[in-house]
Amino acid sequence: MSDNDTIVAQATPPGRGGVGILRISGFKAREVAETVLGKLPKPRYADYLPFKDADGSVLDQGIALWFPGPNSFTGEDVLELQGHGGPVILDLLLKRILTIPGLRIARPGEFSERAFLNDKLDLAQAEAIADLIDASSEQAARSALNSLQGAFSARVNHLVEALTHLRIYVEAAIDFPDEEIDFLSDGKIEAQLNDVIADLDAVRAEARQGSLLREGMKVVIAGRPNAGKSSLLNALAGREAAIVTDIAGTTRDVLREHIHIDGMPLHIIDTAGLREASDEVERIGIERAWQEIEQADRVLFMVDGTTTDAVDPAEIWPEFIARLPAKLPITVVRNKADITGETLGMSEVNGHALIRLSARTGEGVDVLRNHLKQSMGFDTNMEGGFLARRRHLQALEQAAEHLQQGKAQLLGAWAGELLAEELRLAQQNLSEITGEFTSDDLLGRIFSSFCIGK
């Protein structure tokens, strides 16, 4: 298998459909056109032609599109054949194309990978293709499209350019120490560095929003049996996703629901009631519940309001609170307000949010929805956002750390050489986002998660 091979893959989903598309990219795409179509179509014009088998018989007829490189998606010669979407027809056409020597089936994401390697897309834009396909809400789709059109890359490239100018200034000060003006201590470098740090902080804030849109927030509902956890899951999901009975221990396994709150994806997880297990099945369910809790972004601690008047989680169930991971955010949810007569709404107890509601009637659930949105700092009014992946957040965080360390070197010891090195490392971190500085292993992991025809 060579990266110089001509590749072919189905670009439409498998199964039956009105249209099925095969995409070919590489230097032999021209030969495929001449062999299967009998002619080379006019570049970038739709040509209605028969698709022929090796014996000259017609396999199908449809639209052929010819994009000679470098003016194509991949930067190579690209041919697209748009025929009928029957799986048998597409399979016959694919087999016909593969009889031509030098062609092979594309690896997942190989078309996008070639576009990246041929400088048609940077890495952040290439990732945005997969994110656009996988978008689970309108806002996520719009943000992914912004990334594909270069919004995220432009912000990163602006930071890289600012760091480049700052590095030139710092290294000039190091190389010419005998000048009358001390460039390191005259305040200009500190001012420029502060500007870059402020710009980076703004990009990090937008990237966290983008990561929320892409990754979502994992919220685990936990508590004792019969506290109303499954009822709350159903209320948040807007459907009967979980079985609800008065029998303690009805939920034995983990239940998952994917919902959206004003465009923000939430992974809501209902768990088995936590207690001493009465049998092996319940024990496994409780074990899985704790595994989910340990991986959660937030825990909704469900409390049956008819069993206690306490509101402090450490007073309600100290053993449960003690076992939770450090710094895991907790929201105390006092359920069954329709029975206790408690006032619906939200307050705060010892640093924890407290919400009183009725999962059965749905009263107060909107307060919880708004709280979940606010707790992650999600801004639905932010325009022109972009999607961000975990690796993007890590690169931005590392760049910010290097800039802060560089600032400390500048202000603490006027150490120009150490500042220059921190600036170089920050620039390297940012360049990893767009792929200007990226390992082959990382590229392999990214593109292997794509669709075959992308």
Swiss-Prot record:
Outcome, altering T251S: 4-fold decrease in GTPase activity and 1.2-fold decrease of affinity
Cofactor(s) needed for function: K(+)
Ligand binding (GTP): 226-231, 245-251, 270-273, 335-338, 358-360
Effect of G249A: 22-fold decrease in GTPase activity and 7-fold increase of affinity
Mutagenesis or variant effect for R224A: 1.5-fold decrease in GTPase activity and almost no change in affinity
Free-text activity regulation comment from the record: GTPase activity is strongly activated by potassium ions.
Binding site for (6S)-5-formyl-5,6,7,8-tetrahydrofolate: R23, E80, K120, K454
Top enzyme category: hydrolase
Matches recorded under SUPFAM superfamilies: P-loop containing nucleoside triphosphate hydrolases (SSF52540), TrmE connector domain (SSF116878)
Effect seen on changing N226K: 70-fold decrease in GTPase activity. 2-fold decrease of affinity for GTP
A Pfam family that the UniProt record links to this protein: TrmE_N
Effect ascribed to mutating T251A: 92-fold decrease in GTPase activity and 59-fold increase of affinity
Protein's cellular compartments: Cytoplasm
Enzyme Commission no: 3.6.-.-
Sorted UniProt keywords: Cytoplasm, GTP-binding, Hydrolase, Magnesium, Metal-binding, Nucleotide-binding, Potassium, tRNA processing
Result when mutating D338N: Strong decrease in GTP binding. Does not affect hydrolase activity, but has 10-fold higher affinity for XTP than for GTP. Partially impairs tRNA modifying function
A Gene Ontology biological process term: regulation of cytoplasmic translational fidelity
pH effect on activity, per entry: Optimum pH is 7.5-9.5.
Domain called TrmE-type G: residue spans: 216-377
Consequence recorded when altering L255D: 1.5-fold decrease in affinity for GTP
Cofactor, free-text remark: Binds 1 potassium ion per subunit.
Classification via HAMAP family: GTPase_MnmE
Protein task: Exhibits a very high intrinsic GTPase hydrolysis rate. Involved in the addition of a carboxymethylaminomethyl (cmnm) group at the wobble position (U34) of certain tRNAs, forming tRNA-cmnm(5)s(2)U34.
Family annotation (PANTHER family): TRNA MODIFICATION GTPASE GTPBP3, TRNA MODIFICATION GTPASE GTPBP3, MITOCHONDRIAL
Protein name: tRNA modification GTPase MnmE
UniProt organism field: Escherichia coli (strain K12)
